[in-house]
Amino acid sequence: KIVNLAPNYSDVTKFADLWVPVRPGTDAAFLLSCIHVILQEFHVNRRSTYFYDYVKQFTNLPFVVQLDEQDDGSYLSGRFMRATDFSQYAEEENADWKLIQLEQGTDKVRLPIGTLGFRWEEEKTGRWNLEGKDTQGEEFDPMLSCMGDDGEFEEVQVNFADFTDTFDTKLGQTEGKGNRAKKVLRGVPVKRVTNADGKEVLVTTAFDVLLAQLGVNRGLSGAYPTDYDDASQPYTPAWQEQETGVDRELVTRVAREWADNAEKTEGKSIF
């Protein structure tokens, strides 16, 4: 099936199964809404085994992100935590380029092979691939979310920048001067780890940051959208409708069909 995402009816559209006539310059809003739907329905409401296993092994989503506390008690998403941040891994070769994961079920800090630092080791060990193993060759299950399956977790408020209203998308009315990004406070599940300096640090995973940034509702506190029809928060189908002119039901349909095909064919959906 071919879906043509374009403002104008063209020769490509004639041969497509579906035409999505977005306003010029708003395709990002449409696609971000698709991602919102896919995360909500294939990762949260129902955990797709194929997607779950794939993102844990082949993406940066299970890697640990440090949260930086602000003066008002809220937090900002910081950098990825590295081997240099932990005493047990600080002497690793290229330690600044080796990233950290947490082990599911134990919360233990683990150093997986396969990140950039392993590619450039002096001794060519061939440990270049993410295989779910640590530096000792032991297999472990990386934690994808700090929320956990048992429903027990700690939550803090994290500041996210909403850039969706920095420019007006109405044609011919943008003056070239952007608005300031809005500050959005959202709850994020966290874990506590002790770094090489003996300091306790709040961390989360890139997956948890992504879900919060895109407003995927998991029952956490803060400015999350209530449902797909909530146009007050960015990335929902209703929000993209007012930006792109595409009906909210259509964006939901496209997202579901794209992800459903990817799940059933193990990755044979392409944009």
Language-model regions, residue ranges each:
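Long, well-ordered, tryptophan-enriched scaffold segments
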Residues: S10-K14, L18-K264
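Short, acidic/small-residue loops that bind anionic groups at enzyme active sites
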Residues: K1-N8
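Short, intrinsically disordered, charge-balanced linker/junction segments flanking boundaries
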Residues: K1, E263-F271
